[in-house]
C-alpha cells in the first residue's frame, strides 16, 4: 500500500452551493478505486458525451496543493473563470492529484517517479478518448512543482508511445518550479516538440515562492528566470512574462505572486485563448520583447482592446 505522502489520485470537482469541492472516486469502504476501475468509469462516461468535440485537459497541481483549502480556491477560480465558459471546448478536466508532506526536498526527489506512474494510465486514456472522439484534443496544465510531475509523465509517455510527431495540443507550464535549462540540449524536455504542438511557459520575475526554491535548489527556476536563448530550444516553446499583471482575486497571491494562473483574470483569459484559439478574445494583447516567442501581457480592460494577436 502506498504511503500517504506518495499517494496518486484522479480527482473530479463537484459543485456544492457556491463551492467547487474536490472529490475522488471511492469504493464503499472509502478507499480509492483502482486505476483499472477508473479507466472503465472514464470510458463509459466519455462515450456518453454528446458533443462532437470533448477535449481533455490534464491538470497537475503544485507542492502541498492537494489540501482541501487550496483545491477549493483553485477550483472556484478555474471553473468560474475558464472551465465553465461557454466557448471552452475542454469539458473533460482530469485532476492528477499527488499527496506530499512538508519535506520539500524529499518530495521533489519523488516527483519524476510519480509522473512516470501517472503516465501509464494517461497513456490508456489517450487511446480510449481517441477511439471515442477521433478529433478530440488533449492538453496539459501544470503548476509549480506539478511541472516536475509532468517531466516524469513526458519521459514515460515518450518511452511508451515512441512518437516523433506531436500528439498533444498544448502544454501550459504555469510558474514552473523546474530547472530553466529543461528545454536545452540534454535537458529533460529537450524534445518537447515531438510531444506537443505548443509549449507555453508563464513566468513572473518577482515570484516569491520560486525565489525561495532557487535558494534551496541553487539553480535557476524556469518560472522565475525564464529562457535566455530561444535559438537553442525547440521552436514550439513560448515564454509569457506576467510580471506586469497586477490584478488578483486572491490576497495571498499579492504576496507570493505564484498562483496567478488561477487568480489573475488576464492570465486566465490568456490560457482560455491558448486552449480555444478559434474562440479567442482580442485581449490580452501580447507584447513582443527581445524575441518573437518572448512575450508579455498586462492587465487591460476588454473595451480597450481592438485587435487580436495570434500565437
Describe the residue ranges of each PLM region:
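Lipolytic serine-hydrolase domain surface
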Residues: 1-50, 63-65, 71, 75, ...
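Gly/Ala-rich beta-loop-alpha elbow adjacent to hydrolase catalytic centers
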Residues: 118, 142-146, 150
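Generic beta-sheet signal
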Residues: 55-56, 136-138
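Loop/helix-junction capping segments adjacent to catalytic residues or to phosphate/diphosphate-binding pockets
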Residues: 67-68, 148
Amino acid at each position: 500500500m502506498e504511503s500517504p505522502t506518495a499517494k496518486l489520485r484522479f480527482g473530479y470537482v463537484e459543485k456544492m452551493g457556491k463551492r467547487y469541492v474536490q472529490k475522488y472516486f471511492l469504493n464503499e469502504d472509502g478507499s480509492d478505486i483502482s486505476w483499472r476501475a477508473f479507466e472503465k468509469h472514464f470510458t463509459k462516461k466519455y462515450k456518453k458525451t454528446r458533443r462532437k468535440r470533448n477535449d481533455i485537459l490534464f491538470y497537475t497541481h503544485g507542492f502541498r496543493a492537494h489540501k482541501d483549502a487550496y483545491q477549493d480556491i483553485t477550483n472556484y477560480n478555474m471553473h468560474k473563470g475558464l472551465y465553465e465558459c461557454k466557448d471552452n471546448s475542454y469539458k473533460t478536466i482530469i485532476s492528477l492529484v499527488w499527496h506530499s508532506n512538508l519535506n520539500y526536498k524529499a518530495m521533489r526527489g519523488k516527483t519524476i517517479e510519480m509522473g512516470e506512474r501517472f503516465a501509464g494510465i494517461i497513456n490508456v486514456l489517450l487511446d480510449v478518448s481517441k477511439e471515442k472522439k477521433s478529433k478530440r484534443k488533449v492538453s496539459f496544465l501544470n503548476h509549480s512543482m506539478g511541472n516536475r510531475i509532468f517531466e516524469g509523465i513526458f519521459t514515460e509517455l515518450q518511452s511508451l508511445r515512441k512518437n516523433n510527431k506531436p500528439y498533444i495540443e498544448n502544454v501550459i507550464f504555469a510558474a514552473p518550479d523546474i530547472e530553466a535549462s529543461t528545454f536545452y540540449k540534454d535537458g529533460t524536455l529537450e524534445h518537447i516538440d515531438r510531444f506537443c504542438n505548443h509549449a507555453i511557459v508563464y513566468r513572473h520575475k518577482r515570484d516569491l515562492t520560486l525565489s525561495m526554491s532557487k535558494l534551496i535548489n541553487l539553480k535557476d527556476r524556469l518560472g522565475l528566470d525564464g529562457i535566455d536563448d530561444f535559438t537553442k530550444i525547440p521552436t514550439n516553446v513560448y515564454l509569457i512574462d506576467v510580471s506586469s499583471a497586477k490584478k488578483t482575486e486572491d490576497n495571498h497571491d499579492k504576496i507570493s505572486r505564484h498562483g496567478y494562473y488561477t487568480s489573475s483574470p488576464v492570465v486566465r483569459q490568456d490560457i482560455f485563448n491558448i486552449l480555444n484559439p478559434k474562440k479567442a478574445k482580442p485581449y490580452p494583447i501580447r507584447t513582443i520583447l527581445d524575441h518573437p516567442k518572448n512575450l508579455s501581457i498586462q492587465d487591460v480592460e476588454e473595451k480597450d482592446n481592438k485587435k487580436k494577436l495570434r500565437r
